[in-house]
Amino acid sequence: IRLANSARFGLARTVGSVDDAITMVGLNQVRTLCLAACMGDAFPDASDIDRDEFWKESMACAGFSHWLARSIGADAQQAWLTGFMLRLGELIIAQQEPDKLAIIEKLPHAPGGRWEREVDQTGFTEGHVVGELVRRWNFPQEVVRALQFSSDPLASKPFSRLGGIVHIAMLLAEIGVESTTSPQDTINALPADVLKQLQLDHEWLQNNLPDVNTFTDTAA
């Protein structure tokens, strides 16, 4: 119900029943949200992670992944779930090596900087970790590869389009949640080589970039 009443759908009236909410949101999105909620409950909160920021970035990454995938004709629901799962890898790192978390979460949070600190401290990124988890859970190989190469999708041979989508989506999420920049500055901060592989045009992105709040207002 909360999702159906969010700014994403822009309804003129308030949705008050589960049936109406499911009709508005769609069964695919409901299934994805249920799975995401279960996965979130499976991992305890870590004291050195800002809980509000963590889940907002997860929802923003999922939302931007869905938007990008739909824009280029990829599987939008698969992209949403892959984008949502990415930061769960950091929670696994927090469980296994809690002493490393304070350094990984060190401020300021420059876009992509957390991946670098994760590698410096553990030898892996959150994407490597959660990619191995979903491999053991028998997720589709496309999702496994996308997560494993999410920090460097160009290293995947052949190129992982889903990995590229999630990479760009996570950068957009970090910029959107943690800073206030114009659409032009936001797009200019993205890696041109990955955008080229995804055949995403700078001008189109600037003109159509969604407000991060359309994704994060359901994250609390």
What is each residue range found by the language model?
Residues 1-100, 105, 109, 113-188:
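Conserved alpha-helical "signature site"
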Residues 192-220:
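Terminal helices and disordered tails flanking the catalytic cores of nucleotide-processing hydrolases
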